[in-house]
Amino acid sequence: MSIGLRAVIITLVVAGGFGCSKDGSSSETKEVSITEAKGACADIHKSQVCTWAKMQGENVLEVGATVPIGSIENAPADTTMVWPPVPVAALDIPDVARQKSGMTNLTMFWEAQGHPTGAFFTPHFDFHFNGISSAEINAIDCKDLTKPTALPAGYALPDFDLPPDASKMMGVKTMIGLCVPKMGMHAVPTVDIERKEPITASMVVGYAIGKPIFVEPMISKALLMKKESFDLTMPAVSGWTGAQASKFRAEYDAQKQEYRLIFSDFSAAN
């Protein structure tokens, strides 16, 4: 065998050794599998609503909640109004996703008669995806009415003059920035403030002492009962602590008879 041929054979053998591992598999990095972390669940109107997070390694792909249609269908038509409102559920987001999603917990409200302003006086659900702890939420008393210096494009933070009966119950004549104790202020799209007919769905942004603290898909019962998937535009929220989702979709599964409320496309945490 010539020296030149021997060199070629050695080169090919060595190169082949770098291309395969001992078990014959490629040495290229394998794709990290996608997993779903389970959060908390609660019985709401005879059905279980649960939070979850879809992860790929340490990266958050989606955060959301599973909402069975039974929890919508069985919502009572008449409820006694209390102040401040009490959530039908308070559910933690999975630990693994909190920091990288900017979301800590979900508080869900059933508004049988709706609430201010005009277009929101229709039966609907409020899904508050909060970026602060439950203790911080419960400490909100609407005494410091500092408004944020900047709002998302196309949003407003209106004040609402209350009728006498509501004013007596709430203890104020005007809801500054639509501030609700144990919730915060509510910034809403200006098109929904000006709307004459009842809303079907809206993406609300919440504030406390000038800082953003939640994003809220506000969705009418009528829309949810259509059992159809839909999207809502996510605003860019200045001052939000942590990552922000740039997409929201309510995806209906006819076979499972449930919605998945999905936040996705998260930015890097601030």
Describe these PLM feature segments.
Residues 1-8:
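Bacterial N-terminal signal peptides that target proteins for export
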Residues 28-36, 40, 116, 255-262:
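Non-catalytic accessory regions used for complex assembly or targeting
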Residues 31, 41-44, 57-123:
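Short N-terminal edge-element motif at the start of the domain
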Residues 32-33, 45-53:
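Phosphate/adenylate-binding glycine loop and adjacent helical scaffold
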Residues 108-113, 125-130, 244-246:
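Beta-strand-enriched cores of mature, soluble protein domains
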Residues 118-136:
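Histidine-centered catalytic micro-motifs
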